[in-house]
């Protein structure tokens, strides 16, 4: 009940356009309004949106340096040089390494992969990693999901006779590393028409270009799309444009013929009998892959993702699942400790940010804790721990606010930083934490907008229960895969009542199972409100209330639709 609801009724012009598109497509005007908001204004565009085609992927050679990268890779193979595939320890990095390694290994055997240890080497290209490459005779490193800021490390590698091809999607600094080729659609002189690829997505485009250059049929790349889909979903990049095509077909691959490693993870997650969605990747598959790098070493995730024997893969997946259980325990403990620290801040009510530092916290979980604090207190949060004599941590942000720019403003206090709009990593000398806290707070206070300081639920449409027909739900499902820039629509219905059977459920009695009647149409719908058991007293008063919700398939009763309640508020009308 504390959330602000934001709904902008459609203008007369928008309503007319939605009706016209509905007439052309046969789709509900409510859903046509959502299509128009996504830039889709004709039946032909709707068809391309609902059925993305792999033939619509951009030419990979439109990316700057792609021709150079392919030539250098071909040269390395021709000379029989040792190649090292190097990547970050998160989901995007490990899937990227697995993808490039698996594909190239079909044509070339003198190849290895490397994932830096989060605790010994930190994020990105490390001197230790370069030394490993040199000692093992590597002449070419393909670095994925990192490297765009590794100016010193790549210069060091160059001195040792090692070339780099960078495949990254992070924002670069003014000075680019001295790599042979830099594949990054965010570089200032970028020529590629889509800038939101994941790190694994950039790796896929590199392999696509390599395949084209060497006469390899595209169908040999399609089995790798499952890894791209996992990376896109887990890295929370926009799922429109080229990412929508890649994710749509990646999910088809996951649900028809996933790689052995992914099949093992799906089995361990208990998802073998259901259709895998972006949500399953974000909340179940991705966290398990991530747990390897958080708790142990990301290399174990790559070992699983490239494994060919299912029984061996299942053993590895179970081990990674254990890491995830450890991660959850650490998450719970550290979040509780962090909450206590935050609640003791004297000026908490006046602050726009949270910055906390605990030398004993586990480095692999601080990003999750930062996310929890952002959710609880709804403000940008930075959580720091001590690693190798530095205060190292993660930042998370609220909707609409660019935390990367806020951190960049304090760059003179930092040893290293990088990331995106809503998530970033950083490190600094411990003596700089106090000044960083002050400057970070100052920047955010001066730049955050009033509407970004409280949780807002953006409502896409107001509907009645009678609008939720089987055809409506089937058309809504065609908007999948959902994600940033194509979020799952949130609907609102006014003046609903408890039908009499709503009750609190859950192991800790934290959820509400609802049966609701719409006062306007008298239609009845089932729903579930997760974590909202405190609302049940109001619901049982027999007074009307408004709900906002997404429409889901009931996982316990296949074919039955239910409402997943996001929030509940008393109706404004008198009862």
Predicted regions span which residues?
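Generic beta-sheet signal
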Residues: 114, 144, 167-169, 183-185, ...
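Hydrophobic helix-and-loop "lid/oligomerization" segment in the mid-to-C-terminal part
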Residues: 2, 9-140, 160-161, 211-435, ...
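Mid-to-C-terminal polyanion-binding domains and interfaces
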Residues: 75-81, 312-316, 322-357, 409-575
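Acidic-glycine-rich active-site phosphate/pyrophosphate-binding loop
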Residues: 75, 171-184, 516-521
């Amino acid at each position: 009940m504390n959330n602000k609801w934001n709904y902008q009724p459609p203008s007369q012009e928008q309503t007319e356009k939605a009706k016209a598109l509905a007439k052309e497509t046969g789709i509900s005007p409510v859903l046509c309004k959502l299509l128009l908001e996504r830039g889709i204004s004709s039946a032909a565009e709707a068809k391309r949106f609902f059925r993305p085609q792999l033939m619509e992927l951009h030419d990979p050679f439109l990316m700057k340096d792609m021709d150079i990268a392919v030539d250098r890779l071909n040269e390395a193979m021709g000379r029989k040089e040792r190649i090292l595939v190097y990547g970050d320890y998160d989901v995007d990095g490990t899937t990227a390494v697995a993808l490039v390694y698996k594909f190239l290994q079909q044509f070339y055997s003198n190849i290895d992969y490397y994932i830096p240890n989060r605790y010994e080497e930190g994020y990105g290209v490390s001197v230790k990693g370069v030394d490993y490459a040199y000692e093992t005779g590597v002449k070419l490193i393909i670095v994925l999901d990192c490297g765009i800021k590794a100016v010193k490390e790549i210069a060091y590698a160059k001195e040792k006779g090692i070339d780099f091809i960078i495949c990254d999607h992070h924002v670069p600094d003014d000075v680019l590393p001295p790599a042979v080729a830099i594949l990054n659609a965010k570089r200032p002189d970028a020529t590629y028409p889509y800038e939101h690829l994941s790190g694994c997505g950039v790796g896929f485009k590199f392999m696509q270009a390599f395949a084209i250059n060497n006469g390899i049929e595209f169908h040999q790349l399609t089995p790798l799309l499952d890894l791209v889909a996992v990376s896109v979903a887990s890295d929370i990049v926009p799922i429109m444009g080229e990412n929508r095509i890649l994710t749509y077909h990646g999910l088809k691959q996951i649900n028809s013929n996933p790689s052995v490693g992914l099949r093992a993870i799906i089995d361990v997650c208990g998802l073998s009998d259901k259709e895998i969605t972006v949500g399953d990747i974000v909340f179940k598959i991705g966290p398990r892959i991530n747990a390897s790098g958080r708790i142990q070493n990301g290399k174990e995730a790559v070992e699983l993702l490239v494994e060919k024997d299912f029984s061996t893969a299942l053993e590895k997946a179970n081990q990674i699942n254990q890491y995830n259980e450890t991660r959850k325990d650490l998450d719970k403990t550290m979040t509780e400790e962090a909450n206590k620290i935050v609640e003791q801040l004297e000026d908490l009510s006046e602050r726009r940010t949270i910055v906390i530092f605990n030398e004993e916290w586990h480095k692999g979980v601080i990003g999750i804790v930062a996310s929890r604090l952002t959710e609880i207190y709804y403000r940008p949060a930075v959580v720091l721990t001590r690693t190798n004599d530095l205060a190292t941590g993660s930042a998370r942000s609220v909707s609409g606010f660019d935390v990367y720019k806020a951190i960049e403003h304090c760059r003179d206090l930092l040893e290293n930083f990088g990331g995106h709009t809503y998530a970033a990593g950083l490190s600094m000398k411990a003596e700089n934490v106090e000044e960083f806290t002050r400057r970070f707070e100052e920047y955010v206070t001066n730049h955050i907008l009033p509407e970004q300081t409280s949780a807002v639920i953006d409502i896409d449409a107001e509907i009645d229960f009678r609008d939720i027909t089987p055809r409506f739900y089937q058309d809504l499902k065609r908007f999948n895969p959902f994600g940033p820039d194509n979020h799952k629509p949130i609907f609102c219905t006014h003046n609903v009542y408890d039908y009499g059977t709503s009750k609190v459920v859950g192991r800790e009695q934290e959820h509400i199972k609802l049966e609701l009647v719409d006062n306007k149409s008298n239609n009845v719908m089932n729903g579930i409100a997760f974590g909202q058991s405190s609302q049940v007293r109001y619901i049982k008063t027999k007074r009307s209330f408004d709900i906002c919700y997404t429409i889901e398939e009931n996982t316990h009763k296949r074919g039955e639709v239910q409402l997943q309640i996001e929030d509940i508020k008393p109706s404004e009308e008198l009862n």
